[in-house]
Every structure is written in structure tokens, then in C-alpha cells.
């Protein structure tokens, strides 16, 4: 079980709703993933039009929690305005906060992100900030009132997996009471498993499932990867070693096997 702002969910896999070949495949993938939380973009769908109504009905049929995002916003003002519109439209105080600084890398504007988070939290929002793996940025977000922090594994859509394991591990070690979600850059179920093995509470992804040859099958694979990673973390992974360590004890080895 994982908790976000006082609400508890069974699945540790959060999934996006964009880029799927069809609405039916999107629904099938979300079901196969077992996800309880789906991200939606206000910029992509407008509930005021026929397309928006149809999309919203599909999401409602899934009986999942909705996490609106501010994807595409490049300023504090734009992100705050989009968040307020999303709250009115979707009826939730949750917001996945994105403030983008660079078009090529889609790297977060960390200064603007912290500023926007502080504004929204004062206005009653429960913020899920998309950030880099920088500890100082994450700490500032926590100081602003965020109870969830979502560092990237790698740039959005890159499918490169965890590129800075040490930094992500440091975040987990230094922020033990904060819900941490790896968001962006996940390309394979093994990447998701690695994040959960580090002690992260969940992962959020979209492209790796939506752009797979078989999104529904891939969603199931990610579900299994997340479950395996969390189970491994709870079981207690052995520490890595620089040198070999025999798995077979030498005590009691027959003398004729001894090395002279």
C-alpha cells in the first residue's frame, strides 16, 4: 500500500493517459497495469467539448483517482493558472506540477517549480512536483509544504532508465518520511523494479507503455516489475561487494578437495 496526502492505494504504479493508439487500448493498458491513479492533461482534453467529454467518460469507467498535470507550462503564472483550471474541471486538489525550462530536455525549471509549489500549497493544493534528482531542490519543495516529491530517472520519454542511481538513493536516505515517486525516463519494467528496489514508493510512467508494440501486455509487465521491486526491497537486498564471496562454505570440505 502507498499513501498520497492521506489517501491509500494498493498499486505503486501510476500511469499516464496520453499517446495510446486508441481509447480502448488506453483503457485496457490501465486495467492491465492495475493502476489506481491516472494522470491527465488539461491541455490535452477539455471537458467542455465533445472530445473532452468522451475522454472523461472513459476515465470515469476505470474507477481510478485522477491526477491532473500542468504539462507544457513554462512559467510560474502559467502553471498556477492551469492548476486552478484543473481543480475546477476535475474536482480535485491534487496537481502534478510541471514547470519546464528547456524544450530539448524537458528539464524542470527548479526555481519556478519551488515558487509555483509554494503558491499552490497556500491555495489548498496537494502538489506532486516533477523535479530533477537534486537533493537541494527536493528539500526546498518539502520546505514549501510538498509531502510528495517526484524526481526524474532521466529526461521525459528518453527510456534511459535510472541515470543517477546514487543521487536517487541519497534522496531516499535523506527524505525518509516523504513519499517519493520516480517520474520520467522509465523505459522498461526492469527500470521500474530498480526504482522500487531503492525504496521508492512508486513510479509514474506513460510513454514506455503507450508506445510499446502491445501496450496492454507491457502494462502487465510493468505491474509485475513494480511488484517484484517492492517485494525485493521489503525482503532486504544483500549489499554489493567489491570482491567475490563463496556461496558454498569451506568448513567440512573433504581433505582431498583441499588446495595444496
From Swiss-Prot:
One Gene Ontology term from the biological process aspect of the record: thiamine diphosphate biosynthetic process
Reaction(s) catalysed (UniProt annotation): [ThiS sulfur-carrier protein]-C-terminal-Gly-aminoethanethioate + 2-iminoacetate + 1-deoxy-D-xylulose 5-phosphate = [ThiS sulfur-carrier protein]-C-terminal Gly-Gly + 2-[(2R,5Z)-2-carboxy-4-methylthiazol-5(2H)-ylidene]ethyl phosphate + 2 H2O + H(+)
Enzyme class at the top of the EC tree: transferase
UniProt pathway annotation: Cofactor biosynthesis; thiamine diphosphate biosynthesis
GO MF annotation terms: thiazole synthase activity
Key words of the record: Cytoplasm, Schiff base, Thiamine biosynthesis, Transferase
Pfam families xref list: ThiG (PF05690)
Listed InterPro entries: Aldolase_TIM, Thiazole_synthase_ThiG, ThiG
Record-listed E.C. numbers: 2.8.1.10
Residues that bind 1-deoxy-D-xylulose 5-phosphate: 157, 184-185, 206-207
Catalytic residues identified in the record: 96
Database matches in Gene3D superfamilies: Aldolase class I
Protease keyword on record: no
Compartment(s) where it occurs, according to its Swiss-Prot or TrEMBL record: Cytoplasm
SUPFAM superfamilies registered for this protein in UniProt: ThiG-like (SSF110399)
Signal peptide: none
Cellular component, GO, one term: 2-iminoacetate synthase complex
Assembly notes: Homotetramer. Forms heterodimers with either ThiH or ThiS.
Record-stated family: Belongs to the ThiG family.
PANTHER family per the UniProt record, alphabetical: THIAZOLE SYNTHASE
Task performed by this protein: Catalyzes the rearrangement of 1-deoxy-D-xylulose 5-phosphate (DXP) to produce the thiazole phosphate moiety of thiamine. Sulfur is provided by the thiocarboxylate moiety of the carrier protein ThiS. In vitro, sulfur can be provided by H(2)S.
Protein name stated in the entry: Thiazole synthase
Amino acid at each position: 500500500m502507498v499513501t498520497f496526502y492521506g489517501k491509500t492505494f494498493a498499486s505503486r504504479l501510476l500511469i499516464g493517459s496520453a499517446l495510446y493508439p486508441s481509447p480502448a487500448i488506453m483503457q485496457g493498458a490501465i486495467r492491465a497495469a492495475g493502476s489506481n491513479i491516472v494522470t491527465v492533461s488539461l491541455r490535452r482534453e477539455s471537458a467542455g467539448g465533445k472530445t473532452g467529454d468522451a475522454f472523461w467518460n472513459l476515465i470515469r469507467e476505470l474507477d481510478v483517482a485522477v491526477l491532473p498535470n500542468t504539462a507544457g507550462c513554462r512559467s510560474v503564472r502559467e502553471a498556477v493558472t492551469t492548476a486552478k483550471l484543473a481543480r475546477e474541471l476535475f474536482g480535485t486538489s491534487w496537481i502534478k506540477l510541471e514547470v519546464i525550462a528547456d524544450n530539448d530536455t524537458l528539464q524542470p525549471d527548479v526555481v519556478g517549480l519551488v515558487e509555483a509549489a509554494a503558491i499552490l500549497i497556500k491555495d489548498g493544493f496537494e502538489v506532486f512536483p516533477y523535479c530533477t534528482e537534486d537533493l537541494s531542490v527536493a528539500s526546498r519543495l518539502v520546505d514549501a509544504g510538498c509531502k510528495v516529491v517526484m524526481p526524474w530517472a532521466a529526461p521525459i520519454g528518453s527510456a534511459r532508465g535510472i541515470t543517477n542511481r546514487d543521487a536517487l538513493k541519497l534522496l531516499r536516505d535523506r527524505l525518509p518520511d516523504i513519499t517519493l515517486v520516480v517520474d520520467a525516463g522509465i523505459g522498461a519494467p526492469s527500470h521500474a523494479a530498480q526504482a522500487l528496489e531503492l525504496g521508492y514508493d512508486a513510479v509514474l510512467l506513460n510513454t514506455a507503455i503507450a508506445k510499446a508494440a502491445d501496450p496492454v501486455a507491457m502494462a502487465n509487465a510493468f505491474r509485475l516489475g513494480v511488484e517484484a521491486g517492492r517485494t525485493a526491497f521489503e525482503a532486504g537486498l544483500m549489499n554489493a561487494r567489491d570482491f567475490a564471496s563463496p556461496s558454498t562454505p569451506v568448513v567440512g570440505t573433504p581433505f582431498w578437495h583441499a588446495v595444496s
